[in-house]
Regions:
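Bacterial Sec-dependent N-terminal signal peptides
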Residues: 1-25
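Short beta-strand and adjacent turn/loop elements
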Residues: 22-156
């Protein structure tokens, strides 16, 4: 029960923080990819009754999946991983392959790299964290980027 409350708290926090920044999201294209909802993905559909938090719109975006990775529940983590792979695949199919970055000055690196999107397979770089990265964020970044790179290699 405690886990459910923690997860609900995280999801509500995501919802309210995104709601306050709605106008800025549209102006910042790479960031808008982090919060874009992919609610047509069916990953975890069977578990929706047991874990209602998985049916929240916020859990169908990259940021939401990263936050779900913070859960101690392995079922929720597996669903988050499947959704991250699905989102990476969908963005690739749309012609917007995305690589997530993090670490010191990653936001500035991304701005520089995204000036010309046609220089390296049309890859869009999006920063999920600048200095401090949690283990879950790092793992989510690795899973997402691995899927994107795999798709790029398969389609060369």
């Amino acid at each position: 029960m405690k886990r459910i409350y923690i997860i609900l708290f995280i999801i509500l926090g995501i919802h309210f923080s995104f709601a306050q920044e709605e106008t800025k999201v549209d102006e910042n294209f790479p960031f808008s990819l982090l919060v874009r909802y992919f609610n047509y993905l069916n990953h975890g559909k069977e578990e929706l009754k047991t874990y209602p938090v998985l049916n929240q719109p916020e859990s169908y975006c990259i940021w939401g999946c990263i936050f779900l990775m913070e859960s101690e529940d392995e079922t929720i983590k597996k669903i988050a991983i499947a959704r991250l792979k699905g989102i990476a695949t969908q963005l690739f199919r749309e012609g917007k392959p995305v690589l997530l970055t993090s670490g010191m000055n990653s936001a500035n690196f991304n701005i520089t790299k995204n000036v010309n999107l046609e220089d390296d397979n049309n890859i869009i770089y999006v920063s999920i964290a600048d200095c401090i990265v949690t283990q879950a964020q790092d793992k989510a970044q690795g899973i997402f980027n691995h899927q994107t790179r795999k798709l790029i290699e398969e389609n060369k």
